[in-house]
Amino acid sequence: MNRRTFLGGLAAIGLQGSMLNVSASPLARMMSPKRKKKVSGRFDEDAVILISDMHVLPNGHTPGYLTRVVKEILAMNPLPRNVIGLGDLANLYGHVEDYECARQLFAPLEEAGINLTLGMGNHDRRENFARVFPEKAVTTRLFDRMVFVVKTPRADFIVLDSLQESPDLGKWITPGAISQEQMDWLRDTLRGYQKPVFVAAHHSLDETKVLPLLRDCPSCCGYLFGHEHRWRTDSPVFQWGKRGILRTMCLPSTGYWGDIGYVQLHLDEDRAVATLHQSEYFFNYPLKEGEERPLQWALNAQDNDGSHCSFSYQRPG
């Protein structure tokens, strides 16, 4: 059956018009983002790159993966105005050498004029981070934590510090937590916030316990986190029986283990749309020379790459 015969049959039963006008339906119009780029010279002011779990170890495998991500970002035209990292910049113990290596790897981004914001994860050490990135540490909103605010024309980002430092420099504390001082600061900051805002941390909502504060801020449109080394999205409800939900997104690792890649977030007029760029999957270390890639690893990366996650600025409920 050719296309003309097929459409003729649809017309005969009254379906052709309804099928061909789907693009004009209210739902279709709602689904189409209102995209009008704010380009300033070489930069897209509405483009944000999100990365996490770099685990930079000099002489390890992770610097090569992070270098690839940096090169891909620099190849974008226009360039994103902001890159935001959500913790575990250092490998395991937050050594100064890890941060020094990371600084060299990130240098091309800052030399290109891209704003770089780096949050804390459970493998970081604040003092060592501040020693290598002093200009970033001084911008923290709280004296004893690394808490940052990134402002863009259409939405802002609050990067919390969920790191719990072990008194033993040879150990780390895996679970995350938000200090009471941060909780109080976040509550005060979000009170009356009118602009769309994302709240982010290294750890998930189960550990940071900030969901009640986000619920009370209608302009909070999403929660971003890392730590799990996997691409994962969700929409937790605030209260059963009510319509309120909050979109959440877990970032992949740039190159340690698990889902490997980064997320490109575009801020449109009425929503933000995240796109996953996943290059591969491996556990718990990359393939050795001559080793065959497991089919499931390849399928994981294939299934995830190009996935989207959208955040409406008008939160339901």
Residue ranges and their predicted role:
Residues 2-28:
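N-terminal export signals
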Residues 25-99, 191:
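N-terminal active-site segment of His-dependent metallophosphoesterases
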Residues 27-36, 40-42, 95-187, 191-193, ...:
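Extended active-site neighborhood of metal-dependent phosphoesterases/phosphodiesterases
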Residues 51-52, 83-87, 116-121, 198-202, ...:
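Active-site neighborhood of phospho(di)ester-bond hydrolases with catalytic His/Asp-centered motifs
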Residues 52, 161-164, 203, 278:
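A mature extracytoplasmic/lumenal domain signature
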Residues 56, 91, 164, 205, ...:
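Short, glycine/acidic-enriched loop or turn micro-motifs at the edges of active sites
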Residues 56-61, 166-168, 257-259, 284-286:
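Short, solvent-exposed loop/turn elements at domain surfaces
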Residues 266-317:
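A short C-terminal boundary segment appended to hydrolase-like catalytic domains
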